[in-house]
A protein has these predicted regions:
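Short, Lys/Arg-rich flexible segments
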Residues: 1-90, 96-147
Length: 147
């Protein structure tokens, strides 16, 4: 799942920053913003993923001997920040095709639900809640460059 974040209310600051900075500086500052934002998103997301009271009952089930060693909320992966041009992207959470490897394949069913369980949507809720903190990080980094 991918969520695009746009910083609103910072238009004037971003324009001043973009006119004063080179493309390399813009890319570096945006990378710093993404790096500082990853733990914020991870912290918020971990509070939104439900945890079972007994970890032994988590995971595949159905008589399977494989079980997870920790709750998904405690093992949210953070990817490496990628810079593309002057923009930067950060991955927080599981890749769609690699959830099996981390033992948290079923976390997708928590978010989107099944025919038996209603969705407990946490991905978009995390993005909405993290928005203010990410805006503050971006504002601080842009202002620090201009000062």
């Amino acid at each position: 799942m991918k969520i695009d974040m746009e910083f609103k209310g910072l238009e004037e600051l971003v324009k001043a920053f973009e006119s004063a900075a080179s493309d390399e500086d813009i890319a570096q500052v945006n990378k710093t913003i993404a790096e500082k934002g990853e733990p914020v998103v991870q912290r918020i997301m971990s509070g939104k993923i439900p945890k079972s009271k007994d970890i032994k009952k988590s995971g595949r089930g159905f008589g399977s001997k494989s079980s997870v060693s920790a709750h998904a909320a405690d093992e949210i992966p953070i990817g490496k920040v990628k810079v593309n041009g002057t923009g930067a992207t950060a991955d927080v959470g599981w890749e769609k095709n690699t959830q099996d490897e981390g033992g948290h394949f079923y976390v997708r069913f928590i978010n989107w639900g099944t025919i038996y369980r209603p969705p407990q949507e946490f991905i978009y809720a995390t993005g909405r809640e993290a928005d203010a903190e990410l805006q503050k990080i971006a504002e601080q980094e842009y202002q620090a460059y201009l000062d």
